Design a protein with these regions (language model features):
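N- or domain-start disorder-to-order transition segments that initiate the globular core
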Residues: 1-20
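Anionic-ligand binding region
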Residues: 195-220
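A C-terminal functional module that forms or caps the active site or interfaces directly
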Residues: 223-291
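Glycine-rich nucleotide/cofactor/substrate-binding loop typically near the N-terminus or early
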Residues: 28, 33-35, 41-98, 220-236, ...
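General beta-strand structural signal in soluble alpha/beta enzymes
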Residues: 24-26, 58-63, 105, 123-128, ...
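Solvent-exposed alpha-helices and their adjacent loops that cap or buttress functional pockets
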Residues: 15-18, 23-24, 53, 115-118, ...
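Divalent-metal (Mg2+/Mn2+/Ca2+)-assisted nucleotide/phosphate chemistry catalytic cores
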Residues: 72-153
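Active-site glycine-rich loop that binds ribose-phosphate moieties when present
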Residues: 108-109, 137-150, 154-175, 209-213
Length: 309
C-alpha cells in the first residue's frame, strides 16, 4: 500500500520519525468538538508546547481536504478551531468516504491511532477514551476506540475512560480483547474528572521508563494491539465525585429523553455536564490533557532510547 497516496506527514514530524526521535500524536476532535473558539486553538497549541518542553515532537492528527494529516501547522489548527463542530467527527468507518470526497474530519481516539500507526508514531496523548455506554446491553453502543486498542499498536495515554460510560463493562471488554490497562502511579482506574472509580487496573507502573519498556516488550513479542495508560487528573483539578456524578446522571437522563445516541452522545453529554458544573468540568478536562501530554512525551523519550539500543 502506498501510504503517501493518502497521508501527509508534516516535515518536522517526518524528520523526527526517520531519526528515531520521540513523537507524540494528538487528536483533533478536542479542537473541533471539545471547546469553543479561540479557547480550542489556545489549548491545542499549549498541548503542543508542553510536548516540546518535555523533549518530544507533537503531531496533531486530522483529515483536511481528504488528506490524512500527521502533524498540523498553526494555520491548520486555527482553521480547525474556527470551523469547530461544522467538521464531522471521523471514526474508522468514515475515513475512506471522507478521503474519497476530499472532506475534512476531526479524528477521534480511533482514527488518531490509525493515522499515527500509518505514520510510524507509537505514543498518543488524549483526554479520555470512549468505551461501553451505559445501557449498552440493550443499545449495543460501544465505542470503536476499544476495538482499535485491541488491534492497533499504539500506546494511548489518557485520564481513564470518560465517566459518562459504564466503566466496569469497558474494562471487561478491554480484558476480553487482551488490552493491558495500566495505572500510572495508581492501582485504581481514574474516571476522567476524578482520580478514583472503584475499579482496579491490571498493573500499576510508576515511571515513564517502565511504561516504555512494557510497551516495547509487547511489540517485540509480536502480541499486536495497543496499551492503555491511565494517568489520574492532578489532585488540585480533580472534581468532587458527588458533584460530577450527579451532573453525569442528569446529563445521561436528558440524552435518553431527547433520543440522542451514537456518535452524538459524547459531545452532548460533555456539553451538558459543562453547563451543569458551571464550566468546572471543562477546566478540569483541559488540565488533564496537559498532564497526559507531559507523561506521553516523557514516555516517548524513553521509548526512543530503547529503540536505539
Amino acid at each position: 500500500m502506498q501510504l503517501n497516496k493518502f497521508l501527509d506527514v508534516k516535515p518536522e514530524v517526518a524528520e523526527a520519525i526517520a531519526a528515531g526521535k520521540p513523537v507524540v500524536a494528538l487528536e483533533s476532535t478536542i479542537i473541533s468538538h471539545g471547546m469553543p473558539y479561540p479557547q480550542n486553538v489556545q489549548t491545542a497549541l499549549e498541548v503542543e508546547r508542553i510536548i516540546r518542553e518535555n523533549g518530544a515532537v507533537p503531531a496533531t492528527i486530522a483529515i483536511i481536504g481528504g488528506r490524512l494529516k500527521a502533524g498540523l501547522t498553526e494555520e491548520e489548527i486555527e482553521y480547525f478551531g474556527k470551523k469547530g463542530t461544522a467538521i464531522a467527527k471521523a471514526s474508522r468507518r468514515d475515513l475512506a468516504v471522507l478521503c474519497a470526497r476530499g472532506e475534512d474530519g476531526a479524528t477521534t481516539v480511533t482514527t488518531t491511532m490509525i493515522i499515527a500507526h500509518m505514520a510510524g508514531i507509537k505514543v498518543f496523548a488524549t483526554g479520555g477514551i470512549g468505551g461501553v455506554h451505559r445501557g449498552a446491553e440493550t443499545t449495543m453502543d460501544i465505542s470503536a476506540d476499544l476495538e482499535e486498542l485491541a488491534s492497533t499498536p499504539v500506546m494511548v495515554v489518557c485520564a481513564g475512560a470518560k465517566s459518562i460510560l459504564d466503566l466496569g463493562l469497558t474494562l471487561e471488554y478491554l480484558e476480553t480483547h487482551g488490552v493491558p490497562v495500566i495505572g500510572y502511579g495508581t492501582r485504581e482506574l481514574p474516571a476522567f474528572y476524578t482520580r478514583k472509580s472503584g475499579f482496579a487496573v491490571d498493573y500499576e507502573i510508576d515511571t515513564p521508563a517502565e511504561l516504555a519498556k512494557a510497551f516495547y516488550v509487547k511489540q517485540d513479542m509480536g502480541l499486536g494491539g495497543g496499551m492503555l495508560v491511565t494517568n489520574p487528573i492532578p489532585e488540585e483539578y480533580s472534581m468532587d465525585a458527588d458533584v460530577i456524578n450527579k451532573a453525569i446522571d442528569e446529563a445521561v437522563e436528558e440524552a435518553k429523553a431527547q433520543g440522542i445516541h451514537g456518535k452524538e452522545t459524547t459531545p452532548f453529554l460533555l456539553a451538558k455536564i459543562k453547563d451543569l458544573t458551571g464550566g468546572d468540568s471543562l477546566a478540569s478536562n483541559i488540565q488533564l490533557v496537559y498532564n497526559n501530554a507531559k507523561l506521553a512525551a516523557a514516555t516517548a523519550v524513553e521509548l526512543s532510547k530503547l529503540a536505539k539500543n
